[in-house]
UniProtKB/Swiss-Prot annotation:
Catalytic activity: 2-(N(omega)-L-arginino)succinate = fumarate + L-arginine
GO BP, sorted A to Z: arginine biosynthetic process via ornithine; L-arginine biosynthetic process
Keyword Amino-acid biosynthesis: yes
Gene for this chain: argH
Protein name in UniProt: Argininosuccinate lyase
Annotated PANTHER family: ARGININOSUCCINATE LYASE (PTHR43814:SF1)
Length: 470
């Protein structure tokens, strides 16, 4: 047992806390993972104390040695908190005092509080993991873009309300998911820029420090571009946690939309994709089954990520300034969100990268469900018919086909003319899937030339994101 109980308070109290309070307060079972960040903060704080004339050269050297020794033991897996330790901060101070003695080790706490300490190191932790998650999202974008590139000009039925709508390129559909995921990466970058400018170190418990410390210097040493403008805000705000939790939840939602499509497309009724054996599972009783477990888990974990966000927001609601112990509850939900995404995204990327698309079946289904009706209406517009009338005429064509049990292209010239004199034989030029997709050649459209441009644009953006991530 060390020379400190692992608690950073006590002089004002005649006795120790009850065992029940100890059990409730203890957080080392989840915040111990912050040890490397706490040690980095302590090194920066020791340097600030030295610059302020509060540590001798010898004291600074000994503190650095002790902190490095603890870091080596943590990396080796031999550094452990004691049951008496309240949190990671108290545990590490106790262990540091054991390492360098109370005369030197006891000097490190000057000028800092757990309040500014945890707010800062939590930001550094989340910034590191934001970069990891962003890289994994980009890997998923690469997998989707690779499938889009391989699909070429293959077509599929585009859907709204899950009903046949208009033919689109398979690549166009896959790239739609890429753009949503790239916005998630943009959100992580935006979040990081805000967090980087706001290091809480130096805020103390809430009012700042009287010891002449250098918050900007500590901020720079820890990778921040600036320090908190308001010490109360620096210690009490957790919007950076909530915003991070939102982005992780949005990533989960975006992945779940892809997952739902994979689940549907892999059914016999759709038959659009075949799952690779390595990325699917079987049944304990039904020998024929090939289950999309990764996609289903992605769909389920999206709910978990949303739950973490909503629980965190409920914790933060109506907290008065400044720090409150409620904020101990801010870490577990976000730790869980980080862990969830960092295990989910690589698995989901593997699933997507190995999907085998049945492009022949997709092409067969692309014109069905009267998906070329909009092309008929737009052809009429180009022939001078007002769209309101053109819409009615195209709808009448669909109704006639339903009565006859045929598709639009199966109507004869005479049947078209019976529906409307404006439907001359020239309408047949738009009654093909290839003609339909090629005609939609405005920016963002599904025409093959535009999709190729889109893919090139997206690839450049991904490369730019990777360069910034290093």
């Amino acid at each position: 047992m060390g020379t400190n109980t692992g608690k950073l308070w006590g002089g004002r109290f005649a006795g120790g806390p009850s065992p029940e309070l100890d059990a409730l307060s203890r957080s080392t079972h989840f915040d111990w993972r912050l040890t490397p960040y706490d040690l980095a903060g302590s090194r920066a704080h020791a340097n600030a104390l030295h610059r302020a004339g509060l540590l001798t050269d010898a004291d600074l050297a000994e503190l650095r040695r002790g902190l490095d020794a603890l870091g080596e033991r943590y990396a080796a897996g031999t550094l452990r908190p004691d049951p008496s330790d309240e949190d990671v901060h108290g545990a590490l101070e106790r262990l540091l005092v054991d390492e360098v003695g109370p005369e030197v080790g006891g000097r490190l706490r000057a000028g800092r509080s757990r309040n500014d300490q945890i707010a800062t190191l939590f930001k550094v932790f989340l910034r590191d993991h934001a970069a990891v998650v962003a890289g994994q999202v980009l890997d998923l974008v690469d997998a989707l873009a690779g499938q889009a590139r391989a699909a070429g000009d293959a077509v599929m039925p585009g859907r709204t309300h899950l009903q046949h709508a208009q033919p689109v390129l398979l690549a166009h559909h896959l790239l739609a998911h890429c753009w949503a995921l790239l916005r998630d990466v943009d959100r992580l970058r935006d979040w990081d820029a805000r967090v980087a400018a706001d290091s809480p170190y130096g805020s103390g418990a809430l009012a700042g420090s009287s010891l002449g410390l250098d918050p900007e210097g500590v901020a720079a040493e820890l990778g921040f571009s600036g320090s908190s403008a308001n010490s109360i805000d620096g210690t009490a705000s957790r919007d950076f946690v909530a915003e991070f939790a939102y982005v992780t939840a949005q990533i989960g939602v975006d992945v779940s939309r892809i997952a739902e499509e994979v689940i549907l497309w892999s059914t016999r009724e759709f038959g659009f994709v075949t799952l690779h054996d390595s990325w699917s599972t079987g049944s304990s009783i039904m020998p024929q089954k090939k289950n999309p477990d990764i996609a289903e888990l992605a769909r389920g974990k999206a709910g978990r990520l949303i739950g973490n966000l909503s629980g965190l927001l409920a914790t933060l609601k109506a907290l008065p300034l400044a720090y409150n112990r409620d904020l101990q509850e801010d870490k577990e939900p976000v730790f869980d969100s980080v862990d969830t995404l960092e295990v989910l995204l690589p698995a989901f990327t593997g699933l997507v990268a190995t999907l085998a698309f049945d492009t022949e079946r997709m092409a067969d289904l692309a014109p069905q469900g009267f998906s070329l009706a909009t092309d008929v209406a737009e052809w009429l517009v180009r022939e001078g018919v007002p769209f309101r009338i053109a819409h009615e005429v195209a709808g009448a064509c669909v109704r006639r086909c339903e009565e006859l049990g045929i598709e639009l292209a199966d109507l004869t010239d005479e049947q078209f003319a019976e529906i409307s004199p404006a439907l001359t034989p020239g309408v047949r030029e738009v009654l093909s899937v290839a003609g339909s997709v090629s005609a939609r050649d405005g920016r963002g459209g599904t025409a093959p030339i535009r999709v190729r441009e889109q893919l090139a644009e997206l690839t450049g953006l991904v490369d730019g994101h990777r360069d910034r991530l290093g």
